[in-house]
Amino acid sequence: MDNGMFSSFIMIKNLLLFCISMNLASHFGFSQMPTSSVKAETDDNITIFTRILDGLLDGYDNRLRPGLGERITQVRTDIYVTSFGPVSDTEMEYTIDVFFRQSWKDERLRFKGPMQRLPLNNLLASKIWTPDTFFHNGKKSIAHNMTTPNKLLRLEDDGTLLYTMRLTISAECPMQLEDFPMDAHACPLKFGSYAYPNSEVIYVWTNGTAKSVVVAEDGSRLNQYHLMGQTVGTENISTSTGEYTIMTAHFHLKRKIGYFVIQTYLPCIMTVILSQVSFWLNRESVPARTVFGVTTVLTMTTLSISARNSLPKVAYATAMDWFIAVCYAFVFSALIEFATVNYFTKRGWAWDGKKALEAAKIKKKERELTINKSTNAYTTGKMTHPPNIPKEQTPAGTTNASSASVKPEDKASENKKTYNSISKIDKMSRIIFPLLFGTFNLVYWATYLNREPVIKGATSPK
């Protein structure tokens, strides 16, 4: 019995060792089988897709649009703006960097395979039909090719294609500068089919008019503008070759006024104030007032020329032109006011205080000489007077009478003649000029800052 139990124990032990060895062998010896299986499966998929693509392109004619003679080809588009700006006022154009996406369905490229979507190389884009999209208001467009062409092509099993490319576009931006620099603009981006009319190819927005054009949060590259938003729509135009749909996206810009306040408005205001300082100078200070007038006029001329250098040569006056013109009028009026005051001063007695003082001294000396002569004449003939007349009575009376008659006249004339007198015109100008200039500024800024800009051909963003 003991031998039987021992034999059973040996058999169980051997069985356990066999199971353990088989487990270890399966773990270490056959661990490479799944990897080999995955690799084989991957190779099979590559072979399958290669055969699918070869089969799709076999007999494919990329000169013919999808659904030719059966249906209208619908191209869905959307735009992601990565960078907006700069904007050139002189050239009336702007630069924009976008990811331009187009999607359409081509039944000739339907396939069946282990994957529903194929990410393809951009080289395949030249072998299939793609929309002939062009930008109507584009001046120059660049397709980026570093390090490889920045294009993406995806094919779904039902034949739907997604074609994305990175573009940098310089487009026209018509500007109405009547309100410059408190102006706003809507820069359009227009694109559509070049050769296919609406009866063959039609464009639609992928996500509707609300979300089909998106601007990156840090995509603004503008120094003089605020990007307020964008609006999306469509237009239809009729030509001799048919009716075409134009996709439009308007980017709404509001100009920043700070630069122009510092560079133009404040210098103009200070120049006008400086020109009005001359009203507080004596009207006899001809050199000082002349320097004030001429210098301020030349300064305003320089400011008006420099302000126009940053603008295109438009045939109408802008808001800044009106402001500069009014400031120029105030400065020139101050110079004319001085000329008027100087003219009336010259016609009066004291246009030159120094010469007037010398003339007064000469006249005073002449009167003194006249008095002395009359006194000497009386003294010479005093012995012929009758004895009943006192000797000193008549001369004294005559002298006193003469001095009495001269002194009040001299005092009256001296009180009447003032050499540093203030003109009534200057007194009025000190009040009228600042009051008018302040009123003009109040009306000007209230009008232009509260005005809602009207942009033709575009709706304001909500």
Swiss-Prot record:
Keywords noted in UniProt: Cell membrane, Chloride, Chloride channel, Disulfide bond, Glycoprotein, Ion channel, Ion transport, Isopeptide bond, Ligand-gated ion channel, Membrane, Postsynaptic cell membrane, Receptor, Signal, Synapse, Transmembrane, Transmembrane helix, Transport, Ubl conjugation
Cross-link of type Glycyl lysine isopeptide (Lys-Gly) (interchain with G-Cter in ubiquitin): positions?
A: K355
Signal sequence span is 1-31
Q: Which residues lie on this side of the membrane: Extracellular?
A: 32-260
Q: Where is the composition biased (Polar residues)?
A: 395-405
Q: What are the boundaries of the region Disordered? A: 375-412
Transmembrane feature ranges: 261-281, 287-308, 319-340, 428-448
**What SUPFAM superfamilies does this protein map onto?**
Neurotransmitter-gated ion-channel transmembrane pore, Nicotinic receptor ligand binding domain-like
Q: Does the keyword Signal apply?
A: yes
The cellular component terms of Gene Ontology attached to this UniProt record, alphabetical and capped at eight, are:
chloride channel complex; dendrite membrane; GABA-A receptor complex; postsynapse; postsynaptic membrane
Those parts of the protein on the Cytoplasmic side are: 341-427
- UniProt GO molecular function: GABA-A receptor activity; GABA-gated chloride ion channel activity
Residues glycosylated per entry: N45, N145, N207, N236
Q: How does it sit in the membrane?
A: Multi-pass membrane protein
**What Pfam families does UniProt report for this protein, alphabetically?**
Neur_chan_LBD, Neur_chan_memb
The record's annotation in InterPro entries points to: GABAA/Glycine_rcpt, GABAAa_rcpt, GABBAa5_rcpt, Gabra-1-6_TM, Neur_chan_lig-bd, Neur_chan_lig-bd_sf, Neur_channel, Neuro-gated_channel_TM_sf
Q: Where in the cell? A: Postsynaptic cell membrane; Cell membrane
PROSITE patterns listed in its UniProt record: NEUROTR_ION_CHANNEL (PS00236)
Q: Where does 4-aminobutanoate bind?
A: R101, T164
Q: List the disulfide bonds.
A: C173-C187
- Which reaction does this chain catalyze? chloride(in) = chloride(out)
Q: What is known of its domains?
A: GABAARs subunits share a common topological structure: a peptide sequence made up of a long extracellular N-terminal, four transmembrane domains, intracellular or cytoplasmic domain located between the third and the fourth transmembrane domains.
Q: What does the subunit comment say?
A: Heteropentamer, formed by a combination of alpha (GABRA1-6), beta (GABRB1-3), gamma (GABRG1-3), delta (GABRD), epsilon (GABRE), rho (GABRR1-3), pi (GABRP) and theta (GABRQ) chains, each subunit exhibiting distinct physiological and pharmacological properties.
Described function: Alpha subunit of the heteropentameric ligand-gated chloride channel gated by gamma-aminobutyric acid (GABA), a major inhibitory neurotransmitter in the brain. GABA-gated chloride channels, also named GABA(A) receptors (GABAAR), consist of five subunits arranged around a central pore and contain GABA active binding site(s) located at the alpha and beta subunit interface(s). When activated by GABA, GABAARs selectively allow the flow of chloride anions across the cell membrane down their electrochemical gradient.
Protein family (similarity comment): Belongs to the ligand-gated ion channel (TC 1.A.9) family. Gamma-aminobutyric acid receptor (TC 1.A.9.5) subfamily. GABRA5 sub-subfamily.
Q: What is this protein's name?
A: Gamma-aminobutyric acid receptor subunit alpha-5
Q: What is the lineage of its organism?
A: Eukaryota, Metazoa, Chordata, Craniata, Vertebrata
